[in-house]
């Protein structure tokens, strides 16, 4: 029987966070309802944290791989102990139900009445207009931090986020260049299917918006049709309901789990945004070693997703969250983030008509403290058929790709265009100086210099396939495009490299971005160089502004896609 052939425009799980219109205010929240908020305390020694992380992640340093504990990095940047205790004690005296002092953040669970009185704000019930079962409590208006603690608090998180609940848009797809299944990925990048997985190697698929889940029956079907071991999620953090699977979570778990083989899999759902996730992660015992985040939103618009009210700005939110990302890298975890699905114009200019800001950056994909992942696609099929005996059953019903030539993933050939460019806020880190300088010296055409900051962090760092993936969803197979596909795949590759190191008594890769550039500098053929294509198009239009792929690193596909055997060989040389 022919399976359902729908092409899902999933891509990066971007957030339409001008989303207040999606929610209907239902009146004041009941006084006894409990909610959780976070007081972000003013930090110190941030320059020391950055220097330390760059030192222990430099493969040429004598300190390489000497990762820290969460307690060590938190104590480094936290305010004086008496300050955090003063804030926590004040909140306890005010009558909060539960107060947890994490040194540079105080987490409070309290009834609505307490929060309204303490922060001089008003809380309301909001009901989603289409998914009416979804009801949240949020503030309407500003808030005021009590004078007794105001000088020690940067902002309060958890009051203003309005989740964007979206259904994937669909389109019938021809799949003329062949479909992507785990078999194709293993073959293209040379990933062995019998790689010795260490029991402590782990990968975490993170979903935001608190409305994400996968279905275990879909995992069984996916494994059977692909002749692979069924992915088992052994750690679940946050809400999970397998009865209402969605495309994003399904893609992450099926491909992150499949390519990582038998690596321990975590599934983590978050109602709020990046700062909230990062602080919870840092306070988790024995957290996963690799984290894949297929979500993002324009850097200058973080106040639409984060907790900016009153004097806070998107810049301040990004800076503070980047500190938390540095801490995560320093304790031994690799963070990966998607580079976006709306090309260089991004979600700031999806209709390609902005004269003020024709190019966009994305967060966390443009953070210097995550491994930013772009997307490629394969060219037309080769004339020679693949060996039928080697193909899994799924390739009998669907024409799996046999091409080995990668191009930039871009509209109109694909349903998304890989994002890339330069951060609005973060300076260019030293680990990519040489690669970015070579790009500017290459002679490749550039956008007007007034439209981007060449001195800032360039992204993405790497890429992987992001077009024509097949996933099992609600009993059928469907197609998916996006950096939401490439990110968990590269995360799985990092998990394999971690297994090698752990099997040999070495620490995990952790903050692996400097390693990528040092590997590239030592031998550019460790990566497949993508030199055809650009990222000038969005879903709705193609702009005259954007970046072109060229030899070496570029703000389209980074240094390229992995040649696993060569990347492993480089990792094998490290202490």
From Swiss-Prot:
The active site is at 248 (charge relay system), 252 (charge relay system), 484 (charge relay system). Glycans are attached at residues 200, 262, 307, 380, 453. Its EC number is 3.4.21.103. SUPFAM superfamilies: Protease propeptides/inhibitors, Subtilisin-like. PROSITE patterns: SEDOLISIN. Its cofactor is Ca(2+). The keyword Lipid biosynthesis does not apply. InterPro entries: Peptidase_S8/S53_dom (IPR000209), Peptidase_S8/S53_dom_sf (IPR036852), Peptidase_S8_Ser-AS (IPR023828), S53_propep (IPR015366), Sedolisin_dom (IPR030400), Tripeptidyl-peptidase_I (IPR050819). Residues 19-173 form a propeptide. This is Physarolisin. Binds 1 Ca(2+) ion per subunit. Ca(2+) binds at residues 529-530, 552, 554. Inhibited by diisopropylfluorophosphate (DFP) and diazoacetyl-D,L-norleucine methyl ester (DAN). PANTHER family: PEPTIDASE S53 DOMAIN-CONTAINING PROTEIN (PTHR14218:SF31), PROTEASE S8 TRIPEPTIDYL PEPTIDASE I CLN2 (PTHR14218). Residues 179-574 form the Peptidase S53 domain. Autocatalytically processed. It catalyses: Milk clotting activity. Preferential cleavage of 8-Gly-|-Ser-9 in B chain of insulin most rapidly, followed by 11-Leu-|-Val-12, 19-Cys(SO(3)H)-|-Gly and 24-Phe-|-Phe-25. No action on Ac-Phe-Tyr(I)2. GO terms for biological process: proteolysis. It comes from Physarum polycephalum. Pfam families: Peptidase_S8 (PF00082), Pro-kuma_activ (PF09286).
